[in-house]
Amino acid sequence: MSLQRFLQRQGSNGNLEYCADSAYGSYSVLTGQLTMEDNRRIQVLADTVATLPRGRKQLALARSSSLGDFSWSQRKVVTVEKQDNGTFGFEIQTYRLQNQNICSSEVCTMICKVQEDSPAHCAGLQVGDIFANVNGVSTEGFTHKQVVDLIRSSGNLLTIETLNGTMIHRRAELEAKLQTLKQTLKKKWVELRSLHLQEQRLLHGDTANSPNLENMDLDESSLFGNLLGPSPALLDRHRLSSESSCKSWLSSLTVDSEDGYRSSMSEDSIRGAFSRQTSTDDECFHSKDGDEILRNASSRRNRSISVTSSGSFSPLWESNYSSVFGTLPRKSRRGSVRKQILKFIPGLHRAVEEEESRF
């Protein structure tokens, strides 16, 4: 059946009556004062159902009952009558709800208790109902005292228009939970910041000189590179290079000297002298015996160079040679072996000895 069987009639007094075919189920006649917003919702619902396919019209009409409950059954009018010396049998409480969207508060008066077998209980009042109108007077924005005065001034007959406060009560609970969670989050955030600062102090020391430490991404290598100094591998490399340079320098002195220094200074003694060093700053010249030997050898070598007639040595080489910490160039072993061989050649032995004995 088409939706044209669905009749809508509105009287001059604003009353609305619904009639539907039996295929859609029977609807009770609802009579009440409707607003323009309610009429607009009904018209939108009718237009929506009319455009749906036939198979979905039944489902849409079934869902329309929930919209009807929201617009009408949430609001009900209750009349409570009491005896002269009796009570209505209910208690009210006023709540102030904070509206987060518009930064304002809403005041609502709610029934918090209903006595059994009381006039209010028999009239149908329930816990959680919110006062919207009392004796034709809207209670929107009323304080608790104003609502109490309005109820007491009504006499024995009280007409109350109420709203279902389940959603509002649920909203109040959610707002309270939200505020609690915000407070907890704020405390946890403070604890997190404190732990972060403690971690920064443990890792990087005093943070007084760096107030913006939490905003900086510090690299571990840049933090510890200047504090730890060179790596052990670098120290070993420097120590080996220094020791090898000293060994090469002393070996050149040992090969070239002919005054008994060669017999008293061997490679093992050199290794032992350099193994007793305890610091890398002075490198390999800390041994007292090594200092004396190197000083004597240097003086003897300088004397031999000064009296030698050969001009193969440059002044730059002499200045570097006289420096204790300089790496001295040495003669090749091939030249030294040649001198040893020339000693055994007849006619040349005397000349070599005379040349070597000048210093």
UniProtKB/Swiss-Prot annotation:
It comes from the Eukaryota. InterPro entries: Intracell_Traff_Signaling_Reg, PDZ, PDZ_sf. PROSITE patterns: PDZ. One of its GO terms (biological process) is regulation of cell adhesion. GO terms for cellular component: cell cortex; cytoplasm; cytosol; early endosome; nucleoplasm. It is found in: Cytoplasm; Early endosome. Interacts with CYTH1 and SNX27. By its binding to cytohesin-1 (CYTH1), it modifies activation of ARFs by CYTH1 and its precise function may be to sequester CYTH1 in the cytoplasm. PANTHER family: CYTOHESIN-INTERACTING PROTEIN, GENERAL RECEPTOR FOR PHOSPHOINOSITIDES 1-ASSOCIATED SCAFFOLD PROTEIN-RELATED. This is Cytohesin-interacting protein. The lineage of its organism: Eukaryota, Metazoa, Chordata, Craniata, Vertebrata. The gene is Cytip.
